[in-house]
């Protein structure tokens, strides 16, 4: 009830169900990632979206790529557009680093795991994207060959 009044008074802006923002707040490039993280609490930003966060490659996905637990129901979101990748065990829990976007701590796979996952899921994103990610990550010194 209080949130409804604040929205009606123009002191808050409703972005999505359960997600509010201050009006006039500048939009960041990764705002959709913060929205998705709030609406999919067990999800982790992965693959093309994680490459974009790390500044690797030239891919600019129009969907938010998120990894969710294997047996979780698929989140039904109208906005932002979501692309779900199912993972389980250590594939889902290892290599997560929180990145703050618009005041929200968003779980994102680190650069090395993201590039490795690009090869694992090359049938979804394409081998050319995986090779570009490896080349660009190595050139930018964001990856090591340990």
Predicted regions: what they are:
Residues 7, 13-145:
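Nucleic-acid-binding surface
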Residues 1-8:
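Short amphipathic alpha-helical interaction segments
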């Amino acid at each position: 009830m209080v949130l409804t009044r604040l929205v009606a008074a123009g002191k808050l802006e409703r972005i999505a169900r359960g997600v509010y923002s201050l009006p006039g707040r500048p939009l960041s490039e990764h705002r959709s990632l913060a929205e998705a993280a709030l609406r999919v609490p067990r999800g982790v930003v992965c693959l093309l979206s994680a490459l974009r966060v790390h500044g690797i490659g030239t891919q600019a996905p129009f969907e938010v790529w998120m990894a969710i637990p294997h047996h979780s129901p698929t989140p039904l979101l109208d906005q932002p557009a979501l692309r779900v990748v199912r993972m389980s065990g250590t594939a889902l829990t290892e290599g997560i680093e929180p990145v703050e976007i618009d005041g929200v701590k968003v779980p994102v796979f680190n650069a090395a795991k993201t590039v490795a996952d690009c090869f694992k899921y090359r049938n979804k994103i394409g081998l050319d994207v995986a090779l570009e990610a490896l080349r660009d990550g190595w050139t930018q010194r964001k990856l090591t060959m340990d």
